[in-house]
Amino acid sequence: AETTAPSVYPLAPGTALKSNSMVTLGCLVKGYFPEPVTVTWNSGALSSGVHTFPAVLQSGLYTLTSSVTVPSSTWPSQTVTCNVAHPASSTKVDKKIVPRNCGGDCKPCICTGSEVSSVFIFPPKPKDVLTITLTPKVTCVVVDISQDDPEVHFSWFVDDVEVHTAQTRPPEEQFNSTFRSVSELPILHQDWLNGRTFRCKVTSAAFPSPIEKTISKPEGRTQVPHVYTMSPTKEEMTQNEVSITCMVKGFYPPDIYVEWQMNGQPQENYKNTPPTMDTDGSYFLYSKLNVKKEKWQQGNTFTCSVLHEGLHNHHTEKSLSHSPGK
């Protein structure tokens, strides 16, 4: 094989660094023949924290990496350079390590998982979809955005047709010095219920390529929920606070909204279990309202209100109250 000089790439972290931390910088020495190469840092002035890994032979050429770990107070405020020598080709290369982002035309760089942005898409809230006076929204969230490149651009598509009605908030800085960006697309109730597909496309200078996420209503035959209410048990009546329970079963899809009223007034002191798949593939959940025992004993009317697309007008409710003598 003929003598081949190496290509040298500086390796830098993908995001800005916290103060009082250590930072690992690297040099990738790629595609040379024959061995050896030597790698020093700042012409040998940096020697502690250096790791030069054994060369790997691939397709007749060698590649190796060398790294150095320095305090973030040292870099990038002070210059760090890797010095590569390949005697066989009389090559000497000095590469200064400069801060850079992962992505775009960036050469290989050291990126840990926590420094790579993630994109998530969320469905509209069932209450918004099933209430004609509310506006359902599909939400796209980007997290772990580098403060070097906090700007991201959202594009939205409904069944592959681009729409321009989304509301995008400015990036918000998080406690870990990364940014978070949120875009919300208001949608038509029937577009979601009819199973149209919503796609969020996110582009950024920090991404090698756009990231896309898609969401739509779960497929399957709609099944109507059955609603049952249960009074507090006799054993529980020894307590100061009692539980009124609503069981909702046999519904599909799992998107559902359950809330409580007392004498027509909304109540807050309740908890719902997540919709859980039953043995027949439909879903069920329990909702538990906690009330003061005297409120129950006074004969107040408690109503479990359910919103689901399988119901007439998307709504049903079941009420119960204490009957003296029970």
UniProtKB/Swiss-Prot annotation:
PANTHER family: TAPASIN (PTHR23411). It comes from Rattus norvegicus (Rat). Gene3D superfamilies: Immunoglobulins. Residues 1-97 are annotated as: CH1. Disulfide bonds join 27-82, 140-200, 246-304. InterPro entries: Ig-like_dom, Ig-like_dom_sf, Ig-like_fold, Ig_C1-set, Immune_Resp_Modulators. One of its GO terms (biological process) is antibacterial humoral response. Residues 98-112 are annotated as: Hinge. This is Ig gamma-1 chain C region. Residues 220-326 are annotated as: CH3. CDD domains: IgC1_CH1_IgEG (cd21817), IgC1_CH3_IgAGD_CH4_IgAEM (cd05768). GO terms for molecular function: antigen binding; immunoglobulin receptor binding. It comes from the Eukaryota.
